[in-house]
Amino acid sequence: MKNWPRLAFIAWVLLRQGMDQLVLSHMPHASLRLLARLMSIGRTHHEPRGVRLRMALERLGPIFVKFGQVLSTRRDLIPHDIANELAKLQDRVPPFPSDVSRAAVVQSLGRPIEEVFASFDADPVASASIAQVHFGVLHDGREVAVKVLRPNVLNIIEADLALLRVAAAWLERLSPDGRRLRPREVVAEFDNYLHDELDLGREAANAAQLRRNMGGLDLIMLPEMIWDLSSAEVLVMERMHGVPISQIETLRAAGIDIPKLARDGVTIFFTQVFRDGFFHADMHPGNIMVSTAPATFGRYIALDFGIVGTLDSRDKEYLAQNFLAFFRRDYRRVAELHIESGWVPASTRVDELEGAVRAVCEPHFDRPLKDISLGQVLLRLFQTSRRFNVEIQPQLVLLQKTLLNVEGLGRQLDPELDLWQTAKPFLERWMNEQVGWRALLGSIKDEAPRYAKLLPELPRLLHDALQAHARPQRPSDELLLALLHEQRRTNRLLLTVFYLIGGFVAGGLFAHWILPGLLHLL
């Protein structure tokens, strides 16, 4: 295997940071636990485990940094100290040369850069592991931002993914938990996730959808995508001018109403969630500016659309009813909602789940309503749900992470922000739209054309259903099992992170101590 040097380096980094002790000590094999104790002799680590894991991931490069960033959002799965530390991971790397950027743009455009751009800044304004951004001006005078994929990034990622596959294979051999979690399938899913990020055309489509959705809301601005100049490798968009939202004193000096700005951010988020079911899922301060231009004074400016979340009506109903039941302290209804969702095993007792929900939610009411964190409420519900083998939906985990970001930013702008008072009208409006005669008539109107087409086929469909019921097999059960299997796949991705580290350690030890002897015998 040509990647043995890289595998050995990964194992060395993990060993140096004491990750072997963290993983091997939890392995079921006594020999591996003994190995962990022997390898810890003579080594002292003064930093906490979360710090050591973060430092190891930073040393190992972009794919591991991204894995850590994703893992940091799963506070329902990992200890808080590790999640807090991984949240500090920054995807920043030195820029690549401007002539390489220009060459990539020329290749994407299929013509000299001078034919399209009146000017193209040599120095990038931002640089990350996947891409970097340059400013430029088109010949028609439009100012643009040009996002260019890092050269050879695909090969770099493929090399590390190959090693992840090796680690996953070792994991399946070493650990019963590893076999249960199907790490090779998990690595394949992470592969898909990374390749989605490498497609700038997908990011452009996300931006266009958000811009269209937000068109009637005068609280936010999003850049226009310039489709005829963009591709999967190069994204050209309107350049946006504003003040970074983290520069609060600068915004205050410019005359921005800071408390209103905080409320507007919450309004934007809940509009995206409950009206559109499509939300920007990377709303940290680095991706937000505020306009100070007279015509758009005080509006949010959103950037970077690589991560978005999608919610269907079932997700929105789950959220709205859970929040409303929580603030009414109706914990039985919260428990019933979890069971009605179908994500809880059918054998779960409502009263047991109700008691667990009460235990984690009631302490929140020791403080004023304005100080209650909706993101923390969701997090505690997810943590409680895990004890009852609830399959936490990935889109809801993404929303919970984004909600924490929005809350954090809002309270950074205005410590007195009452998130509940801002969110409550959205929840109540959505619930009112889903019940009553108006909602029923709207549903009938929307579904009437489809049902009209089905009416002539009704006898055949009824006959097929009766025939299927008479068969010994249960296709509906098989379909249900397949759907449940799909829901579990994303959670397995992050449940295996520490076991993958164990696979790397074992692979590195094999490469360093065992493989040379085998080669010598051959």
From Swiss-Prot:
GO terms for molecular function: ATP binding; protein kinase activity. One of its GO terms (cellular component) is plasma membrane. It comes from the Bacteria. One of its GO terms (biological process) is regulation of ubiquinone biosynthetic process. Residues 119-496 form the Protein kinase domain. Its EC number is 2.7.-.-. The active site is at D282 (proton acceptor). Pfam families: ABC1. Keywords: ATP-binding, Cell inner membrane, Cell membrane, Kinase, Membrane, Nucleotide-binding, Transferase, Transmembrane, Transmembrane helix, Ubiquinone biosynthesis. It is a single-pass membrane protein. The gene is ubiB. ATP binds at V125, A126, S127, A128, S129, I130, A131, Q132, V133, K147. CDD domains: UbiB. It comes from Leptothrix cholodnii (strain ATCC 51168 / LMG 8142 / SP-6). The chain crosses the membrane at residues 494-514. Is probably a protein kinase regulator of UbiI activity which is involved in aerobic coenzyme Q (ubiquinone) biosynthesis. It is found in: Cell inner membrane. Belongs to the ABC1 family. UbiB subfamily. PANTHER family: CHAPERONE-ACTIVITY OF BC1 COMPLEX CABC1 -RELATED (PTHR10566), PROTEIN ACTIVITY OF BC1 COMPLEX KINASE 7, CHLOROPLASTIC (PTHR10566:SF113). This is Probable protein kinase UbiB. Pathway: Cofactor biosynthesis; ubiquinone biosynthesis [regulation].
